[in-house]
């Protein structure tokens, strides 16, 4: 469980922002959303493969030279 100690004279907004940043770094929200509903193993493999293809395509596009701008 993640805990945040609120410092003396620290506004609530700042403490809440620190808490949100910590949760985001740990990846808890994405993990909870992924586990919210059961996903069949075949659907999980299909989703991961599609993400890998997308990443690969994006990497290849980044390595290509830009088209002439004229």
From Swiss-Prot:
Superkingdom classification of source: Bacteria
An annotated Gene Ontology molecular function: structural constituent of ribosome
Pfam hit, one: Ribosomal_S21
RNA-binding recorded as keyword: no
InterPro entries on file: Ribosomal_bS21 (IPR001911), Ribosomal_bS21_CS (IPR018278), Ribosomal_bS21_sf (IPR038380)
Keywords: Ribonucleoprotein, Ribosomal protein
Gene Ontology biological-process annotations: translation
GO cellular component: ribonucleoprotein complex; ribosome
Entry similarity comment: Belongs to the bacterial ribosomal protein bS21 family.
Protein's name in the database: Small ribosomal subunit protein bS21
């Amino acid at each position: 469980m993640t805990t945040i100690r609120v410092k003396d004279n620290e506004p609530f907004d700042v403490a809440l922002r620190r808490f949100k940043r910590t949760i985001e770094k740990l990846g808890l929200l994405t993990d909870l959303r992924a586990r919210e509903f059961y996903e069949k193993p075949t659907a999980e493999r299909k989703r991961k493969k599609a993400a890998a293809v997308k990443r690969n395509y994006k990497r290849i596009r980044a390595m290509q030279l830009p088209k002439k701008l004229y």
